[in-house]
């Protein structure tokens, strides 16, 4: 009986995830148009094969008019996608402690009023004007933050406070072997998925969905993410702030 209940619960979880990520033809066309936008740089397009943007975007639940924050924006790959997804009626804040040239050059080449770069520390990543957010992304950099003297509990709580009830926090990263914790964050640039789940839910978030679109079961997860001869196994987690 217990095994049957566990099996049914698993089926319900899969059904819920399928329902959350289902798209209409107009949604699919919108995401295709975002990925094809001439605003995106060549480096973005070369990265698409490893990032699967047409699957990532619906997973985030982003819609036009939303208020979004991309934490640890790096060169702006995710920030640009999200800025295009929220559109001119929305706003995307791209956070970085020290915004780099690739990120700032995007706006110099293609000014976008809804794409706002903010220099903020990870301990206090949310600018005062970025309240009532609909979605927050932290993509492939949670492991890097773990290498810094950053209070991740404080960071996640600040992100929780900045979101609207029902808002989403998306974390994607290179998967380390189960049980390794943060041991591989500096050497292999990977993190144990369980660490992220635990730290984020401690801030009050609830895990709503897991994405399989970046999974690679053939990855032994024992090589540096940048040196892997194939696409790394990545987890994609969507957390929600309860209503």
Residue spans of the language-model regions?
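C-terminal motif of bacterial Sec signal peptides marking the signal peptidase cleavage site
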Residues: 17-19
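Class I SAM-dependent methyltransferase Rossmann-like catalytic core
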Residues: 31-57
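Conserved class I S-adenosyl-L-methionine
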Residues: 65-74
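A short glycine-rich, Lys/Arg-flanked "PGG" loop and its adjoining helix->strand segment in the class I
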Residues: 83, 152-165
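A short acidic, Gly/Pro-enriched loop at the edge of an enzyme's catalytic core
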Residues: 126-136
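A short SAM/SAH-binding and catalytic strip from SAM-dependent methyltransferases
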Residues: 134-153
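Conserved beta-strand signature within the Rossmann-like core of class I S-adenosyl-L-methionine
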Residues: 166-174
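Core SAM-dependent methyltransferase catalytic element
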Residues: 219-243
